[in-house]
Curated annotation (Swiss-Prot):
Signal peptide residue numbers: 1-19
GO molecular function: calcium channel regulator activity; toxin activity
UniProt name for this protein: U-reduvitoxin-Pr4a
Annotated domain remarks: The presence of a 'disulfide through disulfide knot' structurally defines this protein as a knottin.
Annotated S-S bridges: C24-C40, C31-C45, C39-C52
Purpose: Binds reversibly and blocks P/Q-type voltage-gated calcium channels (Cav).
Domain of life: Eukaryota
Main subcellular location: secreted
Family, as annotated: Belongs to the venom Ptu1-like knottin family.
One GO CC term on file: extracellular region
Tissue: Expressed by the venom gland.
Protein localization: Secreted
């Protein structure tokens, strides 16, 4: 079952790559140095979570 999932993931990325559009990783999805695309505009890849997140939504503690 894992092999089928991996095949489906690779096929999806290949289809998106051949579509000719600018492909990016949306918020909440996995990212990292092994990915061949970056997070969408306004998002950053947090290394400890390996996910694309928005920097504007970080809650701050009020003391």
């Amino acid at each position: 079952m894992k092999i089928f999932g991996l095949f489906l993931l690779i096929a999806t990325y290949m289809a998106l790559a051949f579509a000719g559009e600018d492909v990016c990783i949306p918020s909440g999805q996995k990212c990292g140095p092994y990915m061949n695309m970056g997070c969408c505009k306004g998002l950053v890849c947090m290394s400890y979570a390996a996910r694309c997140v928005s920097m504007g939504g970080i809650p701050r503690m009020h003391i």
